[in-house]
C-alpha cells in the first residue's frame, strides 16, 4: 500500500474520531441545557410554593421550606458564593441556554462538514480499491 493511501486511511480514522468527540460534546451540551431548564423550572416553582425536595445524597430527599425564595445563592468558584435575585438568576440561566443552543448549532455544523469529508474520502478510497482490483485482475495470467 502506498504512502498516500495510508495517509488517506489515517485521515479517515481521524475524521471518525473527531465526529465521535463532537457527538460527546453535543451530549454534554444537552445535559447542561437540561440542568439549566430544570433549575429555571424549580426557581419558577418557588414563586408559587415554598416547599421543595432537598437532596441529601444517594437518592435520599427531605421535604423543606424555603425561607427566602426571592434570593438564590450561586456557586461562582471554589468556596465563593454569590446571592442574587431569583428573577435575575432565571434571566442569566435563560441566556446560558440560548448560548448553549448556539454552540450546539456550531457543533452540529462541524459534524456535518466532517461527515461530508468522510463521505468524500471513502468515495476516493473505494475508487482506488476498485482500480487496484482491476489492475490485479489484468495482471493475473489467464488459464484456458
Swiss-Prot record:
GO molecular function, one term: unfolded protein binding
Single GO cellular component term: cytoplasm
Domain of life of the source: Archaea
InterPro entries documented for this protein: PFD_alpha_archaea, Prefoldin, Prefoldin_subunit_alpha
Family matches, as Gene3D superfamilies: 1.10.287.370
Matching Pfam families: Prefoldin
Keywords annotated in UniProt: Chaperone, Cytoplasm
Biological process per Gene Ontology, one example term: protein folding
UniProt subcellular location: Cytoplasm
Subunit structure: Heterohexamer of two alpha and four beta subunits.
Family named by the database record: Belongs to the prefoldin alpha subunit family.
Function as written in the Swiss-Prot or TrEMBL entry: Molecular chaperone capable of stabilizing a range of proteins. Seems to fulfill an ATP-independent, HSP70-like function in archaeal de novo protein folding.
Name recorded for this polypeptide: Prefoldin subunit alpha
Source organism: Methanococcus maripaludis (strain C5 / ATCC BAA-1333)
